Amino acid sequence: MKKEYFGTDGIRGRVGDYPITPDFMLKLGWAAGCVFAREMPGRRVLIGKDTRISGYMFESALEAGFSAAGVDTQLLGPMPTPAVAYLTRTLRAQAGVVISASHNPYYDNGIKFFGPDGMKLPDELELLIEDYLGRPMTTVECSHIGKATRIVDAAGRYIEFCKSTIPLGMHFSGMKIVVDCAHGSTYHVAPDVFSELRATVSTLGVAPDGLNINDRVGATDPENLRQTVLEENADLGIALDGDGDRLIMVDHRGEVVDGDELLFVIANARHAEGELKGSVVGTLMSNLGLEQAIRRLGLEFRRAAVGDRYVMEMMLEHGSMLGGEGSGHIICRDRTTTGDGIVSALQVLAEIVRSGKTLHELKQGMRKYPQRLVNVRLAERVSLASVPLVQKVKAEVEAELGDSGRVLLRPSGTEPLIRVMVEGADEGQVRELADRLAGAVARAFSA
C-alpha cells in the first residue's frame, strides 16, 4: 500500500501548507499515540526539535495530540536527530519524535519517528499511523490523559555518549578545528564535545534565531567554513547540518571532503584495525571512486536506494557495520542507529590521531570521479516513466559515457525535484552531459 504522508525521511513540507500545519500535527500526535499505545509496551514518547521558529508551535500541537491518546511526552528541546534516537533507546521510551526538516531552509519543517530501538519506524507502522489519521479523533478518559515533562540533562547525556565512541584516553590536544553547527540543533552540543576532548575549537553557526538555520552555513554550504579554516590556519573544519545527522569536512588546505571521502577514511581505518569485514553500503549516488577504493580493500561495496533509511535497511540485511551517502549521512552501526555527524567526525579525528596523518593525506586513498549533480525544480512531484524526450537524451548521454561513467535520474523523496547525476572520467564531458540532460528534464515538464 502506498503511503500518503510519509516519504523517505518522515513527513516534510512548507510550514503552513498542508500537512505541515498545527491542526495536522495535533491529529498526527494523536494517531501516532494510538498506534504506539497499541503496538508497544509503555506510554512514553520523547520529542526533540531543531531550531526552526515553527518547531515550538508543532511541539505544542504534537504534545497535545499524544496527551489526548493517553501517552506521556518528555520534551528534549532543541536536540540533534541522532541524539533523539540515542535517548529514545537509553531512556527506554516507547518512541522518539523529531521536529525538523534537516538541511532545508527555515520555512520548511517536518516530523520523523524513531522506535524504542532508536531505529526509524518500519513501513508497517507508518501505514498504521496513516490509517488512524483517517479516523475521527477522540480523547481518552480524563484520568488517563498523558502528562508532559521536560528532560533538562538531555544534552549532557548525549555529549557523554559521543565521547564514548572513541577509545578511552584518546584526546585531540594540539588540534585546532573549526565547527560549523548551521545555526541548528547541534549549536549547544558539538562545540562542547570537541573542546572536552581537548581540541582548540572555533565556532560558526552557533547563534540560531529561528530563521537562520542552514542559511549559508553548515554541511550544505561549507564555503564560509572553508575560508575560516584557511584564515585561522586550522587543522580542519567540521560542518554539520540543521539537525546534526550529516557531516562534511574541510582539510587544512581548504579542500571540502564530502561524505563519500569520509566514508572511505573511516572504512580504511576500521579495516586496518581489523574491525571491518564484509561489505560497506553506499547509495546509487555514491561516487564510483568510492566503490573502487572499497573493493581495493578487499571489501564488497553495495548500493542502496538514496536515503539513510535505505542504507540502514541494506546494512541490516547484509550485516554491514558501515554505510553512508555522499551528502554526509554516515552510519557507524556498531556505535549508532542512524546517521550522526558528530560521531562520524570523531571517528575521522580518531584516525588522524592514530595515524599521525592529516585529513588531506587520509583521503588520498580514494580518487573521486568527476560528478555533476543538477537539481531540476518542478512545480509538483512527477514521474519520469515514459517521458520520451528524457529517455532519449538519457540514452544518448549513456552512449557517450560508455563503460567509464554512470547516469542517474531520481525524483527527490522530500522535495519536488528531479536529481540529475552524471559521473565519468572527464570533468568537462561530465558537466556538458549533465547540463544537457537536466535541460531535457526541464523542457519535458515545462509545458
Curated annotation (Swiss-Prot):
GO terms for biological process: carbohydrate metabolic process; peptidoglycan biosynthetic process; UDP-N-acetylglucosamine biosynthetic process. It catalyses: alpha-D-glucosamine 1-phosphate = D-glucosamine 6-phosphate. It comes from the Bacteria. The keyword Phosphoprotein applies. The modification Phosphoserine is found at S102. Activated by phosphorylation. Coiled coil: none annotated. Belongs to the phosphohexose mutase family. This is Phosphoglucosamine mutase. It comes from Methylococcus capsulatus (strain ATCC 33009 / NCIMB 11132 / Bath).
